[in-house]
């Protein structure tokens, strides 16, 4: 039986713990830098130590992409990371998934998809052929990505968004819930609506 350490004691950890149980795996430790007084099902939370982390594969279960990246960079010299796929998900044998990435229930990942490290591919999302998803991306529940889409680092695709073939979503961009994206989204932009319109451009996107 595979045993894991989860790093982060927030809402995302609850979902990942459930997947671990569904996959007949073992949660060895739940660790957090600032453990809450009480947590889901009274799970005991430990302070992370180098000795503990070296002994097990780790999944960083922090929803915010920049925070997740910061923790991963800190841990990368210490420990190995686990990739987790819920047993109800379909992941093509011709696709690639990076380390630390989590694939939730009822997800479909089709042929020649490349998913980077430490991504969240959330419940019932569909990723069609030849998409490229870079590191630390969050694909929210029920998102549909048509073929040949590129999602750059740390981008977040909101619940139920739809993106047409061949589009590129820039680094740190946010696609709002329910948006329909029919053209490229620049880095740092926030896009909402049908068709998607830019409502904000971060400092990264303005540079």
Feature annotation, model-predicted:
Residues 84-199:
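Structural signal for interior beta-strand "rungs" in well-ordered beta-sheet cores
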Residues 8, 59-63, 165:
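Small/polar loops that bind or transfer phosphate-bearing groups
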Residues 39-43, 191-207:
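Short, basic/aromatic-enriched C-terminal tail that caps enzymatic domains
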Residues 17-19, 70-74, 115, 187, ...:
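Short amphipathic alpha-helical segments
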Residues 2-5, 27-28, 55-59, 81, ...:
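Short active-site oxyanion
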Residues 1-49:
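Hydrophobic, well-ordered beta-alpha structural blocks that scaffold small-molecule cofactor pockets
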Residues 35-91:
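Phosphate-bearing ligand-interacting subdomains
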Residues 11, 66-67, 96, 180:
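Short alpha-helical
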